[in-house]
């Protein structure tokens, strides 16, 4: 029997390199903040810096958690599923820290804390996302899976997609000027959702490399379009003028290109893994003869 706190061991009690890697990944932002504690403390707004760090990493780890399903198929490595729960609970820990630090920033005044949240739309959206993640974290144990039943548990945890969307909206709305990173994050989220939708539509667990290339292109186009429309609405300019800058790399690499590069990289990994699996299968067939 593995103790709940022994996160580095798998279900059989063996030391797990994969779990150690996941735990290291989750702890890295915390360790970095501790190392930079003196620098943060002497900054203009230390609590605000920590609030944003915790929120940013919560969003990053939420994306990593959502990426487990497609990547265990693309990498042909089913054991990745073993760290999904750890990543999900780790995501909740960061978003809980995000909210706790915000409470501290309000001088631990419950009235002020509630007033701030209920009078700002992006904070209301963030609070809803937090409540949703809290519900998923509370029901992530094996005991809750048995209590709810497999079907009900899966339906409940499908709420993660809506929660991720709310988290992205919250991130966008609290970003004051440059929306490059939020747009890139939105593009990656769109890819993750589109992957699932395309796999469902094709009724397959593994998309072909060609499908992944098409997916990368389609999602990057939507990312370019979404960014152009968003900037056009925010700054009252033509979206076509925004799109004209997509090839102007002197002003920076637009999120659409970043999403395209990420999508093509995934397709390349899939092609390599497919070829490696075919070679392994042929070698085993020859050995069996």
Model features per residue range: what roles?
Residues 1-289:
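Membrane-embedded alpha-helical bundles that constitute the cytochrome b-like, heme-associated redox core
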């Amino acid at each position: 029997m593995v103790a709940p706190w022994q996160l580095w061991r798998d279900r059989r009690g063996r030391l797990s390199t994969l779990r150690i890697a996941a735990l290291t990944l989750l702890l890295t932002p915390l360790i970095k903040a501790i190392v930079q504690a003196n620098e943060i403390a002497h900054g203009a707004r230390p609590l605000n810096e920590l609030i944003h760090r915790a929120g940013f990493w919560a969003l990053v780890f939420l994306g990593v958690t959502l990426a487990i399903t497609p990547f265990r198929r693309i990498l042909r490595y089913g054991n990745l599923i073993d760290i999904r729960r750890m990543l999900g609970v780790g995501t909740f820990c960061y978003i809980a820290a995000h909210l706790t630090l915000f409470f501290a920033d309000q001088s631990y005044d419950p009235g002020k804390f509630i007033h701030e949240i209920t009078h700002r739309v992006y904070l209301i959206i963030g609070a809803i996302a937090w409540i949703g993640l809290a519900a998923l974290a509370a029901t992530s144990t094996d005991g809750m899976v048995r209590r709810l039943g497999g079907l009900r548990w899966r339906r409940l945890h499908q709420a993660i997609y809506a929660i991720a969307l709310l988290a992205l909206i919250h991130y966008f709305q609290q970003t004051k000027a440059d929306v490059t990173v939020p747009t890139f994050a939105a593009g990656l989220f769109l890819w993750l959702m589109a992957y699932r939708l395309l796999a469902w539509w094709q009724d397959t667990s593994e998309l072909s490399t060609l499908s992944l290339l098409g997916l990368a292109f389609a999602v990057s186009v939507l990312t370019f379009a979404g960014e152009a429309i968003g900037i056009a609405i925010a700054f009252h300019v033509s979206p076509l003028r925004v799109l004209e800058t997509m090839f102007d790399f002197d002003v920076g690499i637009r999120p659409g290109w970043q999403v395209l590069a990420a999508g093509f990289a995934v397709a390349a990994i899939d092609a390599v893994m497919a070829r490696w699996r075919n070679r392994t299968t042929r070698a085993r067939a020859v050995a069996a003869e």
